[in-house]
Design a protein with these regions (language model features):
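Extended, charged helical/alpha-beta scaffold domains that provide interaction surfaces
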Residues: 307-314, 320-327, 529-530, 542-810, ...
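Conserved P-loop NTPase motor core
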Residues: 1-562, 611-612, 633
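Short Cys/His-rich zinc-binding micro-motifs
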Residues: 807-826, 830
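Generic detector of short, well-ordered, non-transmembrane alpha-helical segments enriched
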Residues: 377, 478, 606, 720, ...
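Hydrophobic, well-ordered secondary-structure elements that form the walls
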Residues: 434, 482, 724, 760, ...
Length: 831
């Protein structure tokens, strides 16, 4: 660990020295661009683009581009980036994370690397955590880019595909991380190439990068569809777990929050559901629902993890305190919470497409970020994203006072002390910002302040509409603001008139968060740009972090100090112990994210192959060669699977091949046993391929070219999409299933990789088979207009394929229906 830290420290010093030399070059060019007229300055953009086209690199033109952007910023918005902002911009350009304290001007810093990299005409994405910030920054900084002749857009959720495509084609795009990820998934579900909106992913600058790549790393983006009926099972599981007792029927690991049934709880489950063995393979769905019900009832808390609004369960973002409408806990946990809260259970849906931010952002050619707090997570950024954290010096020294924690025995005494401290500061007019980690604490303190007749603003997930306005006024004289976590992050708190003389903004933390980074973010709201400020955390031994990691040793320290319910103490020893506990939690969380990534990387490889195949079909105007090769591949697979270890096909196997080919691949002719018996394998393959392909070519020769092209493309995409959707769900179940392999001394991850690729290979074979069968069996309406086949895959299936079966051919009840529905014949046209 010490070696790793030394390596990081040495690298950071080396990089900063390099950046300072380049920054000096940028400042030396100041006079050159100051003297230019607006028209001359605006003409620099085309000159810089020409230098790139003539063979110079982005790094070659960097000093000039940065100097141009600085001068343009001054002329357009009246602000010229400081020297430290140029250092931050250099850190970003070279693919690092610039750690810049609150108020140091990250938004303006971003303009220089965004302008420089946009000159390549490959597009730059500036990523923010919400649409308010994306819109604000696009409008504010967009003035500078437009002055310099670049195009700028903001990517919003409600935009049409056409509007999104236009936005992505701009030089610089401001967007939320969620919208970028969802657009990527949607692009890989379209059935017409022109409906895709994204360009190749070139360069992303992520604002509040720790929030996006760390806090949200474990939350996958999911596009769902296709309802699965299981509401009753959730209700049954919920009723059962409500009969259980902690430690007797189930146990909770306080450190990891894992919850499991005891042997006694398992026996109760078997009696309750009247089954012999709860963990029998046939009851795997029931076990899953019981596990989710346990989590919902005993580890997920109303007003902390979620709120219930208008009969709906809405997620609360644990790191910002914001509501996340439209998002759902995955894997059935959302439905389990709905059962717990006795609200309508929304039908569980199948996952159509999914990706984590970890895998999405690693697809960019170059990735960088900026934040006020990333140093504590440097190892993770380095290992997973290959980014260093460069700590940028402040423009003015930080003079904020960070007091040692005040320790109390109980929450009750702690809250009384917080109210007393707020009252004392409020009486002299000093603004106070109170940070809480849960909505319930937020509302409790608000009610206590009301009783104390202290006027205040409250900001949490239930009251976020005025977020920016409330936070912006938090530095006014006499203001008191209570906010969950980092609500309002991205909005500066500027001090009102006369506040500096009162000591600046006072920040009070009501308890330590499990992440030091979140605590540092709260402290960082005070003391911006050399302003005075004060921060203080109040801690009790009833706080969650202390309960999870506190020890009797701490309590003995308190007893020795004579601490009782009426007193408090400041203890650097306990503060250090709290930070040690936080480091342990951070370590656990890092391990969990790394663990998730190891599993997601397996799916990532599958996704990469499938999306590449899908895009190849989409980008080809004519996929006839693809479908012919698919048919050939199926026939080769068929023959080789009937070949024994000596490379011989026995007569019995030849009979099976003949039966399969005649039943599934030929309509107007037959394969005879004599044509393949006692022949070489390659000759057998050739005979069958020639017969099948001849019949297919005969079938499509009368079709207009456009009809044939659209039909082949629609079927090819439909089969891939159906199987990919099933594969996602199969891999989810596999992941859940391998988790217990560790008890049998088998590495669950290795089992997941091995069995996952077996499933993937099987899926590719099935895609090959179904594509062939649908194309051979489907009868196409020859009077169909080409445009009717286009649209969604489902439309292509309904409009381009007649739901009729050729007379004279027997279709097995369990065979796939040749109409192209993807269902078995007995469940479709054979009803």
């Amino acid at each position: 660990m010490l070696g790793f830290l030394k390596k990081i420290f040495d690298h950071e010093n080396k990089e900063l020295k390099k950046f300072k030399l380049i920054a000096d070059e940028v400042f030396e060019l100041d006079d050159k661009y100051k003297k230019m007229t607006d028209k001359q300055l605006q003409g620099c953009t085309n000159k810089l683009k020409k230098r790139l086209k003539d063979g110079e690199t982005v790094d070659d033109i960097l000093p000039d581009a940065f100097a141009v952007a600085r001068e343009a910023a001054y002329r357009v918005i009246g602000e010229k980036p400081f020297y430290v902002q140029v250092l931050g911009a250099l850190a970003i350009h070279f693919g690092n994370i610039a750690e810049m304290k609150t108020g140091e001007g990250k938004t303006l810093t971003c303009v220089m690397p965004a302008y420089l990299n946009a000159l390549t005409e490959k597009g730059v994405h500036v990523v923010t955590v919400n649409e308010y910030l994306a819109t604000r920054d696009a409008e504010w900084m967009g003035q500078i880019y437009r002055f310099l002749g670049l195009t700028v857009a903001v990517n919003l959720r409600e935009m049409s595909s056409k509007e999104k495509k236009e936005a992505y084609n701009c030089d610089i795009l401001y967007s939320t991380n969620n919208e970028l990820g969802f657009d990527y998934l949607r692009d890989n579900m379209v059935v017409n190439a022109e409906d895709r909106v994204q360009r190749p992913l070139h360069f992303a600058i992520i604002d509040e990068v720790d929030s996006v790549l760390i806090d949200e790393a474990r939350t996958p983006l999911i596009i769902s569809g296709g309802v699965m009926k299981s509401a009753n099972l959730y209700k049954d599981a919920d009723r059962f777990v409500k009969t259980l007792r902690e430690n007797e029927d189930y146990t909770i690991d306080e450190k990891t929050k894992d919850i499991t049934l005891t042997d006694q709880g398992t026996e109760k489950g078997e009696k309750y559901f009247r089954i012999a063995n709860l963990y029998d393979i046939e009851h795997s769905a029931l076990v899953h629902h019981v596990n989710q019900a346990l989590k919902a009832n005993y580890t997920m808390h109303n007003d902390v993890d979620y709120v219930v609004q208008e009969g709906k369960v809405v997620i609360v973002d644990q790191f910002t305190g914001r509501l996340m409408p439209g998002r759902a806990f995955s894997d059935g946990l959302h439905q389990a919470i709905e059962a717990k809260e006795n609200v309508e259970i929304e039908e569980e849906t199948k996952t159509l497409a999914t990706i984590t931010f970890q895998n999405y952002f690693r697809m960019y050619e170059k990735l960088s970020g900026m934040t006020g707090t990333a140093k504590t997570e440097e190892e993770e950024f380095r290992n997973i994203y290959n980014m260093y954290v460069i700590e940028i010096p402040t423009n003015l020294p930080v003079i904020r006072v960070d007091a040692a924690d005040l320790i109390y025995s109980t929450k009750e005494e702690k809250y009384k002390a917080i109210i007393a401290e707020i009252k004392r500061r409020h009486e002299k007019g000093q603004p106070v910002l109170v940070g809480t980690i849960a909505i319930e604490t937020n509302e409790l303190l608000s009610s206590m302040l009301k009783k104390a007749h202290i006027k205040h603003e409250i900001l949490n997930a239930k009251n976020h509409a005025r977020e920016a306005e409330i936070i912006a006024k938090a530095g006014e004289k006499g203001s008191v603001t209570i906010a969950t976590n980092m609500a309002g992050r991205g909005t500066d708190i500027k001090l009102g008139e006369g506040v500096k003389e009162l000591g600046g903004l006072c920040v009070i933390g009501t308890e330590r968060h499990e992440s030091r980074r979140i605590d540092n973010q709260l402290r960082g709201r005070s003391g911006r740009q050399g302003d005075p400020g004060y921060s203080q955390f109040f801690v009790s031994f009833e706080d969650e972090l202390m309960v999870r990691f506190g020890t009797d040793r701490f309590k003995s320290i308190l007893e020795m100090a004579g601490l009782d319910s009426e007193r408090n103490m400041r203890s650097r020893t306990i503060t250090r112990s709290v930070e040690t506990a936080q480091k342990r939690v951070e370590g656990n969380n890092f391990d969990a994210r790394k663990h998730l990534l190891q599993y997601d990387d397996v799916m990532g490889k599958h996704r990469e192959i499938m999306y590449a195949r899908r895009n190849e079909i989409l980008d080809n105007e004519d996929v006839h060669n693809y479908v012919i090769n698919t048919m050939k591949e199926l026939i080769e697979l068929l023959v080789r699977r009937h070949t024994n270890e000596h490379g011989v096909i026995l007569e019995a196997d030849c009979n099976e091949i003949v039966e399969y080919v005649n039943e599934n691949l030929l309509n107007n002719s037959n394969l005879k046993l004599s044509e393949i018996l006692n022949k070489e394998i390659n000759d057998i393959i050739d005979v069958i391929q020639n017969k099948v392909l001849k019949e297919y070519e005969e079938k499509i020769k009368e079709l207009p070219d456009e009809i044939r092209k659209d039909f082949e493309k629609a079927i090819s995409l439909q089969v891939i999409d159906n199987y990919w959707m099933e594969h996602i769900n199969t891999m989810d179940h596999l992941r859940e299933g391998v988790s217990l392999r560790g008890y049998a001394n088998e590495d669950p991850l290795q089992a997941y990789i091995r069995e996952g690729f077996e499933l993937f290979d099987k899926m590719l074979d099935n895609i090959c088979k179904d594509t062939t069968l649908y194309l051979l069996k489907a009868e196409i309406r020859q009077n169909l207009q080409a445009k009717q086949v286009k649209g969604s895959t489902n439309e292509a299936k309904e409009q381009g394929v007649k739901k009729t079966i050729k007379k004279g051919k027997k279709i097995g009840r369990n065979d796939m229906c040749p109409c192209g529905s993807g269902k078995k014949y007995k469940q479709c046209c054979g009803k």
